[in-house]
Every structure is written in C-alpha cells, then in structure tokens.
C-alpha cells in the first residue's frame, strides 16, 4: 500500500465523516466503513474491499492518534465536529478536527478559509 493511497483514503474518509456528522451520525462500525466508502465514492466503487480495509487500518490509527476519532472496540466515534477549510496557498480542501492544528494537510500553510466561502 502506497503513501499516496493512504493519504488519498485519509481525505476521502475525512470527507465521509464530515458529511455523516452533518447528517447527525457520529458513530461508525469499523467493519462497515470500507463498504460505505465503496458505495458512496466513485473512486472506490470497484475497489477490493479487503484491500481497502487493510489500507484503512493506518488511516484510522492516524485519526485516532490525532484525536479526530476515538475507538471503543469495533465502534469509532467522532470526538468533535470537523471543519471544512480551503488552503489559501494550494487550494486543497482540508477536513480538520478542533483538536488538530489549523494548517493545510498538503502544504502545511496556516492560511485556511471556510469552504465554501460564506456569502456576505
């Protein structure tokens, strides 16, 4: 499993968590996440679910270590809300938890804006 695949899955999983939390869901079954990703994201539509599940292990460990998620057995719970922010330098869309530093996950730039921008 490549570093690129892990970073990409990290972004898609954060996107999934953001969207689900906005719909009121904050607890997830660890085993169902690969299937959910394959169903909801065209990127993983034809993915091998066992491979996707293996790639998800370091991603989930990273999110737990960064206090985005907490693990209770086979259940993953969000520790707070995720903010969707766009980097002013590279335009990357970041999904950051309150506990994480407000820096771009791609270029480490600190100038992040709400995405989409709020209308005045």
Predicted regions and their residues:
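Positively charged, polyanion-binding regions of nucleic-acid-associated proteins
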Residues: 2-28
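A short, conserved structural fragment
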Residues: 61-74
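Short, cationic-aromatic polyanion-contact patches
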Residues: 74-89, 116-120
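Short Cys/His-rich metal-coordination motifs, predominantly Zn2+-binding knuckles/fingers
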Residues: 88-90, 107-108
